[in-house]
Amino acid sequence: QTKQQQEGNTLWLKEGEPSVETMLELFAQYDLNVINELVFCGFGEPLERLEDVCRGIDSLKETYPNLKVRLNTIGLANLIHGRDVTPELKGRFDTVSISLNAPDEKEFLELTRSKFGIQSYEAIKEFAVLSKQYVPNVVMTVVEKVMPEEKIQKCQEICDTLGVTLRVRPFEN
């Protein structure tokens, strides 16, 4: 499908945060056997609602046991919840994709304005490392054309050190 075709066939939230029941009702309108991957993402952090996301995935996997699920995250869930939540990802997510966004903590904080301050950058890297224990695929991402090549190379070095894949996402208007 083209991006234009997808716009009319989307689960983008238009009005507030749905309950788990509403989310499952929306998913029930689709045959999830024909999709490659279900992605939890958004403007914000999907794991703000960790329990709801887990309940929803558990329910969906009862019907679709082979459903592939990806989490797109900023990687701050452990700071949000004040504990290590990565064990709860096991068996639920096949991929965790963390927005690295920057080659250093200062630039990351300038870009994200995280309420957790300068510790956020180390926290996302730790989240990546911890996630590897529970999730088969852990990647960190940056956006091409937004970042010069030398900064992308620095991000690659960070990912190499962490033992995760760097994915350079295409810039989309």
Feature map (PLM): residue ranges:
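Conserved AdoMet/S-adenosylmethionine-binding subsite of the radical SAM
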Residues: 28, 37, 43-173
